[in-house]
Curated annotation (Swiss-Prot):
It is found in: Cytoplasm, Cytoskeleton. PANTHER family: ACTIN. GO terms for molecular function: ATP binding; hydrolase activity. Actins are highly conserved proteins that are involved in various types of cell motility and are ubiquitously expressed in all eukaryotic cells. It catalyses: ATP + H2O = ADP + phosphate + H(+). This is Actin.
Length: 278
C-alpha cells in the first residue's frame, strides 16, 4: 500500500499538478476486488490526500460505458489477468464473473521462449521490454491457426523484421500469431485454463437465461491484450461455434479499447445524474 500511495502522490503532484483536496476522485478497481482493498483505498484518499469526495467503479463496467452501452459482457485483458464480466443495466453480475490468469505478461514470456527457439536470446528485464515491444508491434491473431501455420511454412509472406536497439535486425515469422494464439489455446503455455472465448461463453452461461441474448449481441473487448489485429474476427468465429446457432453474436472492439476504462470513467464522472453519487 505504501507503494500505491507513492504512485498516487506522484500522479496528483507531479503528473496532474492538482490539489487533491479540491477535486473529487474516481478510482477504478478490478472485478471481485475484496471489500478490504476498497476500504483501504478509501481511507488513503480521505486521510492522506484529504479528498472531498470519491467513487470506486469496476473497470469492466467503465469499458462498457465507453462503448455506449449499459448491458453487455466485457472481456477485459490487461497485463496480469483477464476477466469475463457480464453487466446488466450498469451493474456487474458478481456471481457470473469469470477470471482467467492469462494476460499480456504470460504472452510476453511465451514470445521470449519461442524466439529463443529461433536462436535469439532474450533473458534480462531490459530484453523483456524489447520482446513486449515486438509483441505489440508485430503480433496478430490468426483466424484459422492451422491454415496460418501452413501458410507460414510454405512462404515468407508472413515474415517481418524488427530492429533491436543495438542495430541488429531479427526476423519473426509464425511467432507473430503463435504468441497470441495462447489466448485461445492456453495449453500452449502449459495451462489447463479455458481460452478467452470459452471464458466469455462460461460467463454468459452463468447468467440468467433471459439476458444471454443481450450479452451475446454486446460482447465488448477491452484492455491492452485485446489489441491484436484480427482478434475480434477470431472471437466472433469461436463464440459462434460455442453458442446456439440462432443467436446473433456481435463483438465490439473499439480502436481505443486499450484506454476504454479511462474513457468510461471520464464519461461517468461528467454525467449530471452522477454528481450525487460521489
Amino acid at each position: 500500500w505504501d507503494d500505491m500511495e507513492k504512485i498516487w502522490h506522484h500522479t496528483f503532484y507531479n503528473e496532474l499538478r492538482v490539489a487533491p483536496e479540491e477535486l473529487p476522485v474516481l478510482l477504478t478497481e478490478a472485478p471481485l476486488n475484496p471489500k478490504a482493498n476498497r476500504e483501504k483505498m478509501t481511507q488513503i484518499m480521505f486521510e492522506t490526500f484529504n479528498m472531498p469526495a470519491m467513487y470506486v467503479a469496476i473497470q469492466a463496467v467503465l469499458s462498457l460505458y465507453a462503448s455506449g452501452r449499459t448491458t453487455g459482457i466485457v472481456m477485459d485483458s490487461g497485463d496480469g489477468v483477464s476477466h469475463g464480466v457480464p453487466v446488466y443495466e450498469g451493474y456487474a453480475l458478481p456471481h457470473a464473473i469469470v477470471r482467467l490468469d492469462l494476460a499480456g505478461r504470460e504472452l510476453t514470456n511465451y514470445l521470449m521462449k519461442i524466439l529463443t527457439e529461433r536462436g535469439y536470446s532474450f533473458t534480462t528485464t531490459a530484453e523483456r521490454e524489447i520482446v513486449r515491444d515486438i509483441k505489440e508491434k508485430l503480433c496478430y491473431e490468426a483466424l484459422d491457426f492451422e491454415q496460418e501455420m501452413s501458410t507460414a511454412a510454405a512462404s515468407t509472406s508472413l515474415e517481418k523484421s524488427y530492429e533491436l536497439p543495438d542495430g541488429q535486425v531479427i526476423t519473426i515469422g509464425n511467432e507473430r500469431f503463435r504468441c497470441p494464439e495462447a489466448l485461445f489455446q492456453p495449453s500452449f503455455l502449459g495451462m489447463e485454463a479455458c481460452g478467452i472465448h470459452e471464458t466469455t461463453y462460461n460467463s454468459i452461461m452463468k447468467c440468467d437465461v433471459d439476458i444471454r441474448k443481450d450479452l451475446y449481441a454486446n460482447t465488448v473487448m477491452s484492455g491492452g491484450t485485446t489489441m491484436y489485429p484480427g482478434i475480434a474476427d477470431r472471437m466472433q468465429k469461436e463464440i459462434t461455434a460455442l453458442a446456439p446457432s440462432t443467436i446473433k453474436i456481435k463483438i465490439i472492439a473499439p480502436p481505443e479499447r486499450k484506454y476504454s476504462v479511462w474513457i468510461g470513467g471520464s464519461i461517468l464522472a461528467s454525467l449530471s445524474t452522477f454528481q450525487q453519487m460521489w
